[in-house]
Curated annotation (Swiss-Prot):
Keyword field: Ribonucleoprotein, Ribosomal protein
Annotated function: Component of the ribosome, a large ribonucleoprotein complex responsible for the synthesis of proteins in the cell. The small ribosomal subunit (SSU) binds messenger RNAs (mRNAs) and translates the encoded message by selecting cognate aminoacyl-transfer RNA (tRNA) molecules. The large subunit (LSU) contains the ribosomal catalytic site termed the peptidyl transferase center (PTC), which catalyzes the formation of peptide bonds, thereby polymerizing the amino acids delivered by tRNAs into a polypeptide chain.
Similarity section: Belongs to the universal ribosomal protein uS5 family.
Protein name from the UniProt record: Small ribosomal subunit protein uS5
Source species of the chain: Leishmania amazonensis
Lineage: Eukaryota, Discoba, Euglenozoa, Kinetoplastea, Metakinetoplastina
Length: 265
């Protein structure tokens, strides 16, 4: 007796994975990555700190207002918001494996150094360790934005045109490495090794002499020593900064009522 049941159609070879309903991967139904939020999805920033709420409400509109009151930056989105899109540059300076001896043997992780800057007086360095290269790079980039500091620029001689060099000699030290920055005349350029030169370019310094001593082959210490030297440019009060200034209120105090409304909302 012939079989009268209709034959079932086989799924097409080029059918998408979501239609096959295989449910593979951590994303579960619909393909790998959907359950975790794929890389193309960007969540809206919800500030967690008072400073973040003021930045999102456009009550604080520049990094100089934050540095004036020495307010800590706890969210990297603050830097992304205050620096115009396309002006903030980042670059991986160094990444290498590090090991730790445990009871189960050697545990290998990766340490990354990242630099961010707008080439206009702001520079940040971040160093983080991760189990994977991508995790270490992302963590170091976030740390660099949280560690961003202002760089004061000045003149070598007459005050003509825009500031082009550092205003005084400064020295930064990390480990056995010491980096000294010396002001240079306009047109000199950055006289430095490749690693400090990249950091000085990101800081917006056009002309400077440099000298270094110690174990400069340890690039991590060389990077941090250059960063510490640039950070010291705001550690001196030169005569042009001796003028009296009127004190102003802290942004968190000035906009206290707005912050209270945001908290209760």
């Amino acid at each position: 007796m012939a079989d009268t049941q209709p034959a079932q159609e086989a799924p097409a070879a080029d059918a998408p994975r979501a239609e096959r309903n295989f449910g593979r991967g951590r994303g579960g139904r619909g393909g790998r990555g959907r359950g975790r939020g794929g890389p193309g999805e960007e969540k809206e920033w919800v500030p967690c700190t008072k400073l973040g709420r003021l930045v999102k409400a456009q009550k604080v509109t520049s990094l100089e207002e934050i540095f004036l009151f020495s307010m800590p930056i706890k969210e990297h989105q603050i830097v992304d918001t205050l620096i115009a899109e396309g002006k903030l540059h980042d670059e991986m300076m160094k990444i290498y494996p590090v090991q730790k001896a445990t009871s189960a043997g050697q545990r290998t992780r990766f340490k990354a150094f990242n630099v961010v800057g707008d080439c206009d007086g702001h520079i940040g360095i971040g160093a983080r360790v991760g189990k994977e290269v991508s995790l270490a790079i992302r963590a170091s980039m976030i740390a660099a934005k949280l560690n961003i500091v202002p760089v004061r620029r000045g003149y070598w001689g007459n005050k003509i045109g825009e500031p082009h060099t550092i205003p005084m000699k400064v020295t930064g030290k990390c480990g056995s490495v010491a980096v000294r920055l010396v002001p240079a005349p306009r047109g000199t350029g950055i006289v430095a090794a490749p690693v400090p030169k990249k950091i000085l370019e990101f800081a917006g310094v056009e002309d400077v002499y440099t000298s270094s001593r110690g174990k400069t082959r340890t690039h991590g210490n060389l990077i941090m020593a250059t960063f510490y030297a640039l950070r010291k440019t705001y550690g001196f009060l030169t005569p042009d900064l001796w003028a009296d200034t009127e004190p102003s209120r802290d942004p968190t105090d000035e906009h206290g009522e707005l912050l209270a409304e945001m908290t209760t909302a």
